[in-house]
Amino acid sequence: MNPHSWLILKRKVRFGDCDSAGVIHFHNLLRWAHESWEESIDIYGISHQVIFPSCHSHENQNILPIVNCEANFLLPIKLGDLLTVKIFPKKISNHLFQVNTLFLKDEIKVAEGKIIHCSLDMNSKLKVKLPDQLERWIEASNINTHLKEC
């Protein structure tokens, strides 16, 4: 499978994404960053149930709360803009991973986001190793992708 298929996505700015000035409402960038890595794992072939446990499950599963997030707006993102979304996941430690997301319009960087997740046991809330399938996605995303993070 070509990493570009799960690391480079498209997003169109919709009316509901914008404020009264016609530019993206600030919180949507982080939502898009998170939705993009969710879409990426889906394209890669990982079931959402593996990454995001069901509240109905009684198994020992990991949860992945966000422990840090940032968004930088470099140029206005407007209604109707078609954006290319590039995802750069990386493992920070056995229990932490980061997903950097670049948003480009016509190959010009217009925004960037960063989200850091911590892997915790759902019951004890103690730090635990990242799920194996998530680690494989991170590893595969960093092998010969030729994607350059700006």
From Swiss-Prot:
Catalytic residues, chain numbering: 19
* Entry keywords, A to Z: Hydrolase
Going by the entry's taxonomy, the superkingdom of the source organism is recorded as Bacteria
Q: What does the record give as the reaction this protein catalyses?
A: 1,4-dihydroxy-2-naphthoyl-CoA + H2O = 1,4-dihydroxy-2-naphthoate + CoA + H(+)
- This protein's record includes keyword Transport: no
Residue ranges of coiled coil: none
Tell me one GO molecular function of this protein: 1,4-dihydroxy-2-naphthoyl-CoA thioesterase activity
SUPFAM superfamilies with a match to the protein in the record? Thioesterase/thiol ester dehydrase-isomerase
BP GO terms, sorted: phylloquinone biosynthetic process
The answer to whether keyword Ribosomal protein applies is no
Q: Which family does it belong to?
A: Belongs to the 4-hydroxybenzoyl-CoA thioesterase family. DHNA-CoA hydrolase subfamily.
> What job does the chain carry out?
Catalyzes the hydrolysis of 1,4-dihydroxy-2-naphthoyl-CoA (DHNA-CoA) to 1,4-dihydroxy-2-naphthoate (DHNA), a reaction involved in phylloquinone (vitamin K1) biosynthesis.
| Protein name in the entry | 1,4-dihydroxy-2-naphthoyl-CoA hydrolase
**Source organism of the structure:** Prochlorococcus marinus (strain MIT 9515)
